[in-house]
């Protein structure tokens, strides 16, 4: 049997010094034979999705210790993408994912912890912790802070549900008065929790359920609801059980790589496609699979996207539906249940809470279980009062949303669309692929031919859109914003938001080697690979060039002759050391960002680190 890792620091005469230090943290003689379990928290007062996590690490710790373990808490950083959006702060968002993964590895390996409970929530924190979990391959349970309640506001005589993106859209819409914009701003984010739509944070927290690494409801129980407390407590108990199964019984299904297998990653991607998740999830699933040594690529995502239907549309794809509505319809377990009935997932995969996903669905899918516990659990509703306090309300819906024909979650027989909510496009403009969230694209522009309007940065694009340079029928091309070229692969939420506010949301396309916020909708195509900064064809596009986007055939083509492109490439190479860098863009980069750019890879590889790029030959 594998020895407990922690015994490296707790056993033997030569570890007297280490034990002395452990004792100074509160450990006693009887603790030195117990598993030491790291509680990786991500509390910060900068991020509404994390502002309520301060005491939750100790809540988990108490359950770990009651179950026979020793809990030791530490914190990672957390960047708020919404606050970092639209300025130089966004350069740090994606790099923070790697920093979070490394920080978890550093703490866990430096102190020889036996297992981890990952308390995550927002955009890069769950992916960073997931990468660390797959890299370390020791027992782990994920529990997130939970979604924010949707805002409610009365504007122009109508009550409407809203979220962060609504505030951004109306701020650039001159038809709204300053007073109306202020009212929406104040109502958009009423509580603690991750932003209320199917944006990146909530998408990733849903995907940990599909991977089998978190408990049912992790992706959908509101941060404010009393029911969420049970998830934190159960996580503490489950991780001790996983420890015992691995270290005392050598049960490999207690490990992340034994649970989050290739089949589980396919399950997670199928869920993502079915629920129209954020395009960022593609980036993060590729990275997590890479850390676990799992062969999972854009080709696999393309294959899945061609036969998994769209079973749910949530904001931003459907502005009046939010995570609280998904939960009422049965949450992730209900979507997985519909996919399983359609033969679209492998339900034989293990989870941290059940021997197989199939057994978990039998208990938690409200479409097949009569369990009063499950039905009551998914009736957890918003409290409707602004708060930053976790578990502070216990409201219930009077009834569940069990309508699989017209409800928030549909059956395979009654999908929103037969094609899923995400698609991978290939073509000369993106030989290694690019991503579009089809759930947010108007059917009238699924095939779109337009002329390029090229910008060398997000800032330039924003100025061009707001300044009236962009016209209907154009393809806005924003380049040199990839992982290397940015660096940091900024989110393009402001350009897409401003296109929408200018009435161009269904009249223009946007193509970039950067990425998009989970709040993006419209014909927004990101992750173009290879990126401009590594010599990708997107660097050769000129304003006026015709571009064909054909989602039904999964194609994206720059309609310029090979001879013209070859001449442009020669001209680019003639720039010498300045080749494949933007013109007329000055961006001061710190050593931290330059180091990230030197080691990162393109989006088709998940923007993972490849140190061979800087190693001596």
UniProtKB/Swiss-Prot annotation:
Active site: 517 (proton acceptor)
Catalytic activity: (2R)-2,3-dihydroxy-3-methylbutanoate = 3-methyl-2-oxobutanoate + H2O; (2R,3R)-2,3-dihydroxy-3-methylpentanoate = (S)-3-methyl-2-oxopentanoate + H2O
A Gene Ontology BP annotation from the UniProt entry: isoleucine biosynthetic process
Coiled-coil ranges per UniProt: none
UniProt: Mg(2+) binding residues: 81, 123-124, 491
Induction context: Positively regulated by the IlvR protein.
GO cellular component, one term: cytosol
Pfam family, one: ILV_EDD_C
Cited InterPro entries: Dihydro-acid_dehy_C (IPR042096), DihydroxyA_deHydtase (IPR004404), DiOHA_6PGluconate_deHydtase_CS (IPR020558), ILV_EDD_C (IPR056740), ILV_EDD_N (IPR000581), IlvD/EDD_N (IPR037237)
Record-linked SUPFAM superfamilies: IlvD/EDD N-terminal domain-like, LeuD/IlvD-like
Enzyme class, first EC level, given as a word: lyase
Record-listed N6-carboxylysine modification sites: 124
Record EC number: 4.2.1.9
Cofactor or coenzyme needed: [2Fe-2S] cluster; Mg(2+)
Pathway terms, separated by semicolons: Amino-acid biosynthesis; L-isoleucine biosynthesis; L-isoleucine from 2-oxobutanoate: step 3/4; Amino-acid biosynthesis; L-valine biosynthesis; L-valine from pyruvate: step 3/4
UniProt keyword RNA-binding present: no
Binding site for [2Fe-2S] cluster: 122, 195
Swiss-Prot/TrEMBL keywords: 2Fe-2S, Amino-acid biosynthesis, Branched-chain amino acid biosynthesis, Iron, Iron-sulfur, Lyase, Magnesium, Metal-binding
UniProt remark on cofactor binding: Binds 1 [2Fe-2S] cluster per subunit. This cluster acts as a Lewis acid cofactor.
Family stated for the protein in its record: Belongs to the IlvD/Edd family.
Protein's job: Functions in the biosynthesis of branched-chain amino acids. Catalyzes the dehydration of (2R,3R)-2,3-dihydroxy-3-methylpentanoate (2,3-dihydroxy-3-methylvalerate) into 2-oxo-3-methylpentanoate (2-oxo-3-methylvalerate) and of (2R)-2,3-dihydroxy-3-methylbutanoate (2,3-dihydroxyisovalerate) into 2-oxo-3-methylbutanoate (2-oxoisovalerate), the penultimate precursor to L-isoleucine and L-valine, respectively.
Quaternary structure and interacting proteins, as annotated: Homodimer.
The protein, known as: Dihydroxy-acid dehydratase
Lineage, opening ranks: Bacteria, Pseudomonadati, Pseudomonadota, Alphaproteobacteria, Caulobacterales
């Amino acid at each position: 049997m594998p020895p407990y890792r922690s015994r490296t620091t707790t056993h033997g005469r030569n570890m007297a010094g280490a034990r002395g230090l452990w004792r100074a943290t509160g450990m006693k003689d009887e603790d030195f034979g117990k598993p030491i379990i790291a509680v990786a928290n991500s509390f910060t007062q900068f991020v509404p999705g994390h502002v309520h996590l301060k005491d939750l690490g100790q809540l988990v710790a108490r359950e770990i210790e009651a179950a026979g373990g020793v809990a030791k808490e530490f914190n990672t950083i957390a960047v708020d993408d919404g606050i970092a959006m639209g300025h130089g702060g966004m350069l740090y968002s994606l790099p923070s994912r790697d920093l979070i993964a490394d920080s978890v590895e550093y703490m866990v390996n430096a102190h020889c912890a036996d297992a981890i409970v990952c308390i995550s929530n927002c955009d890069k924190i769950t992916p960073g912790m997931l990468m660390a979990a797959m890299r370390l391959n020791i027992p782990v349970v994920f529990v997130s802070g939970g979604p924010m309640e949707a805002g409610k506001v009365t504007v122009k005589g109508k009550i409407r549900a809203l979220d962060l993106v609504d505030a951004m859209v109306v701020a650039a819409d001159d038809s709204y008065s300053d007073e109306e914009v202020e009212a929406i701003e104040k109502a958009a984010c009423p509580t603690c929790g991750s932003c209320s739509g199917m944006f990146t944070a909530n998408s990733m927290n849903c995907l940990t359920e599909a991977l089998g690494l978190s408990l049912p409801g992790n992706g959908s129980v509101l941060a404010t609801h009393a029911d969420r407390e049970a998830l934190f407590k159960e996580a503490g108990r489950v991780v001790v059980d996983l420890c015992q199964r691995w270290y005392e019984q050598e049960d490999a299904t207690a490990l992340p790589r034994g649970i989050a297998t290739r089949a589980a990653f396919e399950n997670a991607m199928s869920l993502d496609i079915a629920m129209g998740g954020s395009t960022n999830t593609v980036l993060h699933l590729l990275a997590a699979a890479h850390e676990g040594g799992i062969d999972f690529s854009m080709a696999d995502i393309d294959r899945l996207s061609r036969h998994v239907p769209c079973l749910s549309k949530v904001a931003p794809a459907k502005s009046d539906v939010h995570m609280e509505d998904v939960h009422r319809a049965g949450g992730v377990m209900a979507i997985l249940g519909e996919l399983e009935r359609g033969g679209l997932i492998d339900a034989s995969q293990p989870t941290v809470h059940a021997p197989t996903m199939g057994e978990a669905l039998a208990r938690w899918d409200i479409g097949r279980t009569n369990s009063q516990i499950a039905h009551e659990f998914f009736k957890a509703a918003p409290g409707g009062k602004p708060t930053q306090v976790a578990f502070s309300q216990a409201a219930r819906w009077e009834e569940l949303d069990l309508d699989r024909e017209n409800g928030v979650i549909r059956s395979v027989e009654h999908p929103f669309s037969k094609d899923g909510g995400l698609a991978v496009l290939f073509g000369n403009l993106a030989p290694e692929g690019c991503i579009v969230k089809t759930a947010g694209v108007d059917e009238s522009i699924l095939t779109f031919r337009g002329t390029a309007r090229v910008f060398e940065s997000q800032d330039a694009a924003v100025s061009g859109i707001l300044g009236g340079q962009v016209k209907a029928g154009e393809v806005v091309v924003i380049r040199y914003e990839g992982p290397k070229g940015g660096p940091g692969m900024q989110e393009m939420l402001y350009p897409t938001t401003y296109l929408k506010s200018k009435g161009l949301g269904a009249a223009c396309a946007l193509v970039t080697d950067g990425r998009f916020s989970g709040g993006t909708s419209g014909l927004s195509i990101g992750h173009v690979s290879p990126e401009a900064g590594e010599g990708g064809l997107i660097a050769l596009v000129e304003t006026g060039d015709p571009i064909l986007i054909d989602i039904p055939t999964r194609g994206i083509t720059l309609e310029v002759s090979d001879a013209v492109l070859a001449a442009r490439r020669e001209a680019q190479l003639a720039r010498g050391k300045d080749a494949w860098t933007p013109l007329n863009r000055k961006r001061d980069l710190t050593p931290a960002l330059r180091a990230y750019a030197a080691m990162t890879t393109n989006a088709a590889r998940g923007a993972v680190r490849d140190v061979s790029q800087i190693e001596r030959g």
